[in-house]
From Swiss-Prot:
Primary enzyme class: transferase
Reactions the enzyme catalyzes: [(1->4)-alpha-D-glucosyl](n) + ADP-alpha-D-glucose = [(1->4)-alpha-D-glucosyl](n+1) + ADP + H(+)
Keywords noted in UniProt: Glycogen biosynthesis, Glycosyltransferase, Transferase
Recorded name of the encoding gene: glgA
GO molecular function: alpha-1,4-glucan glucosyltransferase (ADP-glucose donor) activity; alpha-1,4-glucan glucosyltransferase (UDP-glucose donor) activity
Residues the entry annotates as binding ADP-alpha-D-glucose: 15
Known pathway: Glycan biosynthesis; glycogen biosynthesis
The name this protein goes by in its record: Glycogen synthase
Record family assignment: Belongs to the glycosyltransferase 1 family. Bacterial/plant glycogen synthase subfamily.
Length: 524
């Protein structure tokens, strides 16, 4: 099946949040199931230098009264075809923000739609978050292209200053004025990034004023849990670590803890309970809750805290003040550093995620993979991925609390600290977390089912059936599934521009999209 991912981020080239990880890791897992998966994203100024293969122009066109070019290259890590929408509006280093943010991403969405109609026509166009929210609206009138829309974070619904009442028929939409609502209405299928979050967003507590609409479309809404790349995130082979380790041999983790304490200026003590946090420093992540309990925790327990991230100035200031009150025990690094984040996962004893809401969360998966026990609030994807530790049953992988209250968070931290004081049972807890399977292979099977459902196909793709049989302990039948990979026949291949398009004679075409023409305006 031909699948085109359209997104504002894609790791490792452009990553601001978890969406970048998903768009960078899910496509190769789908390709393993036999799908022809490609990606299209804005050609940001900072992106071009990260490419291993130079991007070549293959097509030029106009949309919304503005000319653009599409460049083709390959993803630097998974090798899948990558298309970049080139226009000066994407040249600045910034990814988000700015007064023209709504125009930029609507323009990108329209360009991606034009590309799908004119250059490479997918069977499924998979859109991610509000930045691509108008694509399902435009594709709604094309019976040959099905759309899937993934909600990574419902809170960010997209600024919108144009009057959409002239292009949408649904009265529900009139209550909103953003692209997220349009996508929810017009996408053929909608999914959230965890089963629990898919249920939560249908309530007033987590629905961000869209719970009525989400209940209205509940028949096409589902939750599919995110995964992680188990090869890229493997403490046994991670070259960024001073020492490697595994669930069978945890010795290297002590070395990582020592190096982390040295690098962050903490007092060297292997027996101190070291808490790590790698996060955007925003309201969602519960950093304010940490600030409310940290002084008391440090006063009554032998604990150290390491925080890595950037975000809200007020939260950054609060963390700096906390570190100044507790030199040698609290370290704050206000940036994002991939190598340091891996060292924090590897060197910390426990990982903090006291989130107000959490669509899925990937950090807790990285933490468990690196033997770092998560302390989380029971919300969203954290419910689906971190079963609570039960010392009597010797089950669970982390410490959980219910209410977003300082006393609940503090109690969970004290329970974790007390468990840490029993080394043997703590190692068992670490091993259980490290041995969890949150690979993309499982998630890819769910997406495969959704793709086939939306396209009206009853049988799973050949490789998907083989993988599912294998995961259930059955022997796959090569004769039934067509071997290890699926190759589309020439008749199934979507038309693509001839090679002359990349030789410099790139044609300019006007929009085939009536809605884009309706909205078409020159940038102000």
């Amino acid at each position: 099946m031909r699948v085109l991912f359209a997104a504002a981020e894609c790791a490792p080239m452009v990553k601001v949040g978890g969406m970048g990880d998903v768009v960078g890791s899910l496509p190769p897992a789908l390709a393993q199931l036999g799908h022809d998966v490609r990606l299209i994203m804005p050609g940001y100024g900072k992106l071009w230098s990260s490419l291993d293969i130079p991007a070549e122009p293959i097509w030029r066109a106009q949309t919304m009264g503005t000319e653009f070019a599409v460049f083709e290259t390959r993803h630097p890590t998974n090798g899948l075809p990558l298309y970049l929408v080139g226009h000066p509006v994407f040249d600045p280093e910034r990814i988000y923000g700015g007064e023209d943010e709504d125009w930029r991403f609507t323009f990108f969405a329209s360009a991606a739609a034009e590309f799908s109609w004119n250059v490479w026509k997918p069977q499924v166009l998979h859109c991610h978050d509000w930045h691509t929210g108008m694509i399902p609206v435009w594709m709604h009138q094309d019976p040959e292209i099905s759309t899937v829309f993934t909600i990574h974070n419902l809170k960010y619904q997209g600024p919108w200053r144009w009057k959409l009442d002239r292009i949408t028929w649904c009265p529900w939409y009139m209550q909103g004025d953003h692209t997220m609502a349009a996508a929810l209405l017009y996408a053929d299928r909608v999914n959230a990034v965890s089963p629990t979050y898919a249920q939560e967003i249908r309530t007033s507590e987590y629905g961000e004023k869209l719970e009525g609409l989400l209940n209205y479309i509940s028949g096409k809404l589902r939750g599919i849990l995110n995964g992680i790349d188990l090869e890229a995130w493997n403490p046994a082979t991670d070259k960024a670590l001073p020492a490697t380790f595994s669930s069978a041999n945890l010795a290297g983790k002590a070395t990582c803890k020592q190096v982390l304490q040295e690098r962050m200026g903490l007092t060297l003590n292997p027996d101190t309970f070291l808490l790590g946090m790698v996060s955007r420093l925003v309201d969602q992540k519960g950093v304010d809750l940490l600030l409310q309990v940290a002084d008391r925790l440090l006063a009554y327990t032998d604990t150290q805290i390491v925080v890595l991230g950037t975000g809200d100035r007020g939260l950054e200031s609060g963390l700096w003040q906390l570190a100044s009150r507790h030199p040698g025990r609290v370290a704050v690094f206000l940036t994002y550093d991939d190598a340091l984040s891996r060292l924090i996962y590897a060197g910390s004893d426990a990982f903090l995620m006291p989130s107000r809401f959490e669509p899925c969360g990937i950090s807790q998966l990285y933490a468990m993979r690196y033997g770092c026990v998560p302390v989380v609030r029971k919300v969203g994807g954290l419910v689906d991925t971190v079963p609570p530790h039960d010392p009597r049953q010797k089950s669970g992988t982390g410490f959980c609390f219910d209410r977003f209250e300082p006393v609940d968070f503090y109690t969970a931290l004290v329970r974790a600290w007390e468990a840490f004081r029993h080394p043997e049972s703590w190692k068992e807890l670490q091993r259980r977390g490290m041995e969890q399977d949150y690979s993309w292979a499982r998630s890819a099977l769910e997406y495969d089912r959704m793709y086939r459902d939306v396209c009206g196909l009853k049988e799973p793709s050949p490789d998907a059936a083989a993988v599912e049989q294998f995961s259930q302990g059955q022997e796959a039948d090569p004769s039934r599934h067509g071997g290890a990979s699926q190759t589309l026949s020439p008749s199934e291949e979507a038309p693509i521009e001839s090679s002359e398009a990349s030789s410099g004679s790139t044609p300019v075409r006007t929009s085939r999209n009536p809605l884009a023409r309706l909205l078409g305006k020159q940038r102000r």
